[in-house]
Amino acid sequence: MPELSDCSASLTKEDIKNFEVELNVKIPAGMKNFYLKFNGGMPSPYCYQPQDEDLDRVEINAFFPIKERTNAFETIEVIAKDIWSRNLMPCNLLPFAMDSGGNYYALNLKNKKIYYYLTDEWDENASREYNFETNTRYIAQSFNYFINHFIEEEE
């Protein structure tokens, strides 16, 4: 599991419960435990090799905090509501982290798997549904698997 720096204020179980109520979501226990330890921040190590072998390793720039923003990042609540309201991401994906290029890591709220959501490959001439499907890449079977398989950067 990575260590995170530049985290937001510590959370309580009540904070997480309020977060779930506010967004009308249910996050897995592993994600709750991670956020009780690290409320957002920058991970070290910061690389991950997706379970989909067709994908190259990815880098995680930051995890978004719950409840209180950091100096650099807004909260999951603000980011999710903004993206969902502008119909830029399916509402069944909860963005919780991003890479340095502005692409998101998201929890699928239905199957609890983790996906890499590309924002820099949006096709203005295609439907939202097409963009949603082609820009969503499976990378981990669960949040626990995701956070427990970070790897050191390769030279």
Outline where the language-model segments fall.
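Compact, glycine/acidic-enriched structural inserts
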Residues: 121-147
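Pocket-edge structural micro-motifs
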Residues: 97-98, 109, 118
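Broad, structure-driven detector of short, well-ordered beta-strand segments within folded domains
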Residues: 103-109
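Catalytic Cys-His active-site segments of thiol-dependent hydrolases/isopeptidases
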Residues: 115-121
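A surface-exposed partner-binding patch
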Residues: 1-103, 151-155
